Amino acid sequence: MIVLITGASSGFGWEAAKLCVAKGHRVIGCARRTERLQALQKELGDAFFPLPFDIADADALNAAFERLPEDWRAIDVLVNNAGLALGQAPAHESRLADWEQMIATN
């Protein structure tokens, strides 16, 4: 089974990738932080394919999937874990750019 996990560079996504590989699945790990995905690949080996890109960028997403080898493209499970929270100000004091980025990502 091939599992695609967004937000795989830390937290729940990181742990989910480790668990899925331990259960015998192949995992595509997506996140913006290339170095964190590479560290996870070192830990998990060939059962993990790092696919760095910004999920809020449609062009980057399309380009990323073009980089996937053919035998990694039949995705069985999506763990849609990517997300972010910018600014902790009340809504009326928040920046519009922060809201736009959160909506695009989450």
UniProtKB/Swiss-Prot annotation:
<dbReference type="InterPro" id="IPR036291">
    <property type="entry name" value="NAD(P)-bd_dom_sf"/>
</dbReference>
<keyword id="KW-0560">Oxidoreductase</keyword>
<dbReference type="Pfam" id="PF00106">
    <property type="entry name" value="adh_short"/>
</dbReference>
<dbReference type="GO" id="GO:0016491">
    <property type="term" value="F:oxidoreductase activity"/>
</dbReference>
<dbReference type="InterPro" id="IPR002347">
    <property type="entry name" value="SDR_fam"/>
</dbReference>
<feature type="binding site">
    <location>
        <begin position="4"/>
        <end position="28"/>
    </location>
    <ligand>
        <name>NADP(+)</name>
    </ligand>
</feature>
<protein>
    <recommendedName>
        <fullName>Probable NADP-dependent dehydrogenase in aabA 3'region</fullName>
        <ecNumber>1.1.1.-</ecNumber>
    </recommendedName>
</protein>
<comment type="similarity">
    <text>Belongs to the short-chain dehydrogenases/reductases (SDR) family.</text>
</comment>
<keyword id="KW-0521">NADP</keyword>
